[in-house]
Regions:
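Short, Lys/Arg-enriched N-terminal segments with co-localized hydrophobic residues
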Residues: 1-10
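Hydrophobic transmembrane alpha-helical segments in integral membrane proteins
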Residues: 9-22
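Juxtamembrane "helix exit" motif at the C-terminal ends of alpha-helical transmembrane segments
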Residues: 11-12, 62-81, 144-160, 164, ...
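Cytosolic/stromal cytosol-facing helical appendages immediately following the last transmembrane segment
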Residues: 14-17, 126-130, 173-313, 398-422
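Select subsegments of transmembrane alpha-helices in polytopic membrane proteins
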Residues: 51-64, 132-139, 305-316, 365-368
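Membrane-embedded catalytic scaffold of the fatty acid hydroxylase/desaturase
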Residues: 53-62, 84-246
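Substrate-recognition/cap regions that form aromatic- and gly/pro-loop-enriched pockets
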Residues: 301-417
Length: 422
């Protein structure tokens, strides 16, 4: 099937890259400690990586229209297919893909409905390699439209998705504060320096540097901004999220659009809200429900303090969802099994966020027992392992460790103190 082949090509590259991602994160963390310039906080990193896990797991619960449209175009409307065995097909596809990625990325900042899908990637107020893995779960809704021309041009599907995966993997390493400007390389390619600009909320850096592989598009279309020594980047978004909850991270702009559309008295504005330039609001709604203006001179990162054991528990749950996702990806699952597995990923990420936000332990423990009972039932009945015994062992091991944590967390003496940045 067209869609199965398309998925497998991209997924394999990303899955193979994961061990290198983990190693690079460890090395960056170690380097920051040595240089006494740590750029990691455990709570922010758990939040970013949890969103990355949900993004990768999203394919188990969605049926994207994009692949079907691509198939129709390839069969009925495209130019003759290019030869995927020729090197120039791949080079051409790489350049063309990045060109359309530039416009997707740019519109993802300039149009509210596309910003709603992209905003999760920018919410981190740290800038490190885990930020690169902080991905949306809703980009599939409209992002595919921008790459239709590649299929019309006759570029084979396996080439498109492969160069897309390579483009995505390339972007991983540019999410770091530790790499300085790179001379001539800055003129052609996306680098850590010019991508730091992209993630900053400073006035002079806003809405700049959209390229994925090549920075040439930004220079050509007037959206390039060099990183300035006199203007240190302040990372994050205007109107900070102030939450580790992945559901809020993925939906808050959609919710804001819906609220503005609902409250405005003008029918034209009810539609315009969704497709307007980012930041625009109906005048009557902006007057009735004003939003707080961002003052970067008073900026403080969202960083609720929690007991050390809570932080360790959060890391344990991150390891669990990452392991579960890996098992889901390496085994053929029935659709409802995949759907149930993604539900486990989501509920675990949400309850972990409750802990990391510093909510009272007694309330969290009650929610955790409910979640754990549901999770263990799903793991036994519809687990990701290839056999029932494997599912039972996986569920038993996870349940035993989880219950041990909850026993300690329910004791008041372990619910005090706080943990600093990693």
């Amino acid at each position: 099937m067209f869609r199965a082949k398309e998925r497998a090509s991209a997924m394999n590259i990303i899955v193979y890259a994961i061990p290198f991602f983990v190693l690079a994160i460890v090395l960056e963390l170690f380097y920051g400690w040595i240089k006494q310039r740590n750029t990691y906080r455990l709570n922010d990193s758990i939040s970013s990586l949890s969103l990355g896990v949900l993004s990768q797991g999203r394919r188990f619960v969605t049926l994207g229209i994009g692949a079907y449209v691509y198939h129709l175009i390839t069969v009925y409307f495209s130019l003759p297919l290019m030869d995927a065995s020729q090197w120039y097909t791949w080079v051409l596809a790489m350049v063309i893909y990045d060109f359309f990625y530039y416009w997707l990325h740019r519109m993802g900042h300039e149009r509210t409905i596309l910003w709603a899908a992209h905003v999760a990637h920018h919410q981190s107020e740290d800038y490190n390699l885990t930020t690169a893995l902080r991905q949306t779960s809703t980009g599939f809704l409209l992002g595919w439209v921008f790459f239709i021309p590649m299929y019309l041009l006759g570029i084979p599907a396996e080439v498109v998705v492969t160069v897309g995966a390579i483009n995505l993997v390339y972007q991983f390493w540019v999410h770091t504060e530790h790499v300085p400007k790179l001379g001539w390389y800055e003129w052609i390619f996306v680098t850590p320096s010019n991508h730091r600009v992209h993630h900053a909320q400073n006035d002079c850096y806003m809405d700049r540097n959209y390229g994925g592989l090549f920075i040439l598009w930004d220079r050509l279309f007037g959206t390039f901004q060099e990183e300035l020594e006199k203007e240190p980047a302040v990372f994050g978004i205007r109107g900070a999220l102030k939450s580790w909850n992945p559901v809020k991270a993925l939906t808050h702009v959609y919710v804001e659009m819906f609220q503005d559309s609902w409250h405005t008295a003008h029918w034209r504005d009810k539609i315009k809200v969704w497709f307007s330039r980012t930041g625009w609001r109906p005048a009557d709604v902006a007057m009735r429900f004003p939003r707080e203006k961002t003052d970067l001179s008073q900026f403080e990162r969202y960083d609720p303090k929690v007991p050390p054991l809570v932080a360790i528990y959060g890391f344990f749950q991150l390891v669990f969802v990452a392991l579960l996702l890996n098992l889901m990806q390496t085994n053929e699952l029935a659709y409802w099994h995949g759907f149930a597995g993604w539900g486990v990923l989501l509920t675990t990420a949400v309850t972990t966020a409750f802990w990391l936000e510093g909510r009272p332990a007694e309330k969290n423990v009650n929610w955790e027992f409910l979640r754990l009972a549901a999770v263990l039932s799903i793991l036994v009945v519809a687990g990701p392992s290839g056999d029932d015994v494997g599912n039972l062992l996986f569920a038993t091991s996870y349940g035993a460790v989880n219950l041990s944590f909850l026993w300690f967390l329910s004791r008041k003496k372990h619910a005090t103190g706080s943990v600093p940045a990693v």
